[in-house]
Amino acid sequence: MYEYLDRRYAVALYNIASAENKVEEYIADLKQINDLIKNNEDLNQIISNPKISTTKKREIFTSIFEDKIDLKLFSFLIILIEKKRIDQLTGIILQIEKVDLDNHNQVVAEVKTVVPLNNSERTALIDKLQIKYNKSIILREVIDKSIIGGVYVRVGDDVIDGTIKNKIEEMKKLMFIKG
């Protein structure tokens, strides 16, 4: 829903981080801060409560993070608080990771199989995906017994579903249409 705005914030922060050669540091810090917000019930309630003033939220963030993270990253978080966007931090992190991948001509391919791929299967899959997308592939393998067999691949919005589970679903649909 807010992907466009998340991307604008992410690009702005990425440009700052890149100029400082701190992209990985910023992403790691943002993930830790996001985890802290999600896992600390009090902090989460403070941030999500519209009745708590922006000034109070800024004071709380300052007391927690001011001397613990890079000053420019801290300033970015304060801007998010002032613009009432701090609750969108997860989306901003996803977007900054996408920007970083794009700038390194990389793409993530999520691969689901019932059993782990062997080295030759992994290499062949990476080679085919690199040709198709003309980018370096970062393979994220997931073992998923529910697919029964075959391979499921997601690259961005593209899905290649060669699973037995999908074939069964397609046959069910055909049976209901003809039946």
Curated annotation (Swiss-Prot):
Keywords: ATP synthesis, Cell membrane, CF(1), Hydrogen ion transport, Ion transport, Membrane, Transport. Signal peptide: none annotated. It is a peripheral membrane protein. InterPro entries: ATP_synth_OSCP/delta_N_sf (IPR026015), ATPase_OSCP/d_CS (IPR020781), ATPase_OSCP/dsu (IPR000711). GO terms for molecular function: proton-transporting ATP synthase activity, rotational mechanism. F-type ATPases have 2 components, F(1) - the catalytic core - and F(0) - the membrane proton channel. F(1) has five subunits: alpha(3), beta(3), gamma(1), delta(1), epsilon(1). F(0) has three main subunits: a(1), b(2) and c(10-14). The alpha and beta chains form an alternating ring which encloses part of the gamma chain. F(1) is attached to F(0) by a central stalk formed by the gamma and epsilon chains, while a peripheral stalk is formed by the delta and b chains. Belongs to the ATPase delta chain family. This is ATP synthase subunit delta.
